Amino acid sequence: MKIKLKICGMKFSENIQEIADLQPDFLGFIFYENSVRNYTENSIIYIPESIKKVGVFVNERHEKIIKTIQKYDLNIIQLHGNETESYCLELINQLNHNQLNTKIIKSFLVDDYFVFQTLNYYQMVDYFLFDTKGILPGGNGTKFNWEILEKYHLEKPYFL
């Protein structure tokens, strides 16, 4: 399995360019007003097509996600809140209705007591993301015990 690199929290043009020059696989832009890394520019500077643009959302309305995908030409969206199975299914319907071929990452906050059977309800998404359960939504600057991933037995690719 090839390891891929996703760098998230892109906000400033000069920083985006410097990181893009390093050719990561994915660049993440946060579209969550309560985040200090919320991306508010009118456009994203040129990024080579080989780098996929990821939009990160937290419990956002489908309509706003669709508009943001279209505005910034996002390749992937990351759902980093309490989005339910039915929320994800409806979002997929909206993406299809708008003829958007946008992939979906669904994040899960993991601690030593995470119930991996929960993932069975989210088979409709393209990827999972396992993040440390912390105070804030999104990255908290700490890692969880990766040994817990020995309990992961699905085929779906995931991010850490």
How should each PLM-predicted stretch be described?
Residues M1-L160:
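Conserved N-terminal beta1-alpha1 strand-loop-helix module at the mouth
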